[in-house]
Amino acid sequence: MSLEIWFAFVAACSVMLVIPGPTILTVISYSMAHGRRANVPLVAAVALGDSTALAVSLLGLGSLLAASAFWFTVVKWAGGLYLLYLAAKMLRAGLRAPGNASASDVAAPKVPASRWRLFANTYLVTALNPKGIVFFVAFLPQFIRPGAPIAQQLWILAATFVTLAAINATAYAVFAGAAGRLLASPRAQRRFHLAGGSLLGAAGIWALMARRPA
């Protein structure tokens, strides 16, 4: 693979990744609610989730989802409903949080209760995005040179995309977490939970409205 093609791929991916989708909205909402403690599990989940989506795309599931409206809809609804479930949990936590909660209560939110749950929730949101899986099937071949080893090129492109996605998620997580720390009062944290739940709800609706590429 030539450097020109690789740089073109990096540029195209960077433009697309900067635009927030369901995964990044999830990262922002959790970072706002949980601060710096969420950064590592969130970024790791994005990297592993994108790796999973890339793997299943290359193994043929992406082609199946592109060809079958039924299976695309099944995966789409699974991901969208899961996002709405997470949104409901975060909104409920925000509504139940008293305005005069102690700082310790705010610093250690109970929903989700652990870094593992932050990781698992974000991973599922990323991996269960059928539009992303189909996107990889349509997008990666545009940067493949027929005369060169196909598998090697796919590995390079996949590793590049996952790296860029992790960097992008890190940037969003750091900025969102910083906003949460700057406004660390109980009332502000309650608002962050409500805002985060709203973002997750928007991401869920976005996922449910996704259409199968023609």
Segments (PLM) and residue ranges:
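Short, strongly hydrophobic alpha-helical membrane anchors
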Residues: 1-4, 214
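Juxtamembrane transmembrane-helix termini in multi-pass membrane transport proteins
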Residues: 3-73, 138-162, 169, 173
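Kinked, hydrophobic transmembrane alpha-helices enriched for aromatic residues
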Residues: 11, 127-141, 203-206
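Short, conserved phosphate/pyrophosphate- and ester-handling motifs at nucleotide-, phospho-/glycolipid
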Residues: 21, 129, 197
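Juxtamembrane helix-boundary/capping and inter-helix hinge elements in multi-pass membrane proteins
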Residues: 31-38, 113, 181-184
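Membrane helix-loop-helix hairpins that form the core translocation module of multi-pass transporters
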Residues: 37-118, 175
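Selective transmembrane alpha-helices of multi-pass membrane proteins
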Residues: 67-100, 165-176, 180-214
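Selected transmembrane alpha-helices and immediately adjacent juxtamembrane segments
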Residues: 115, 122, 126-131
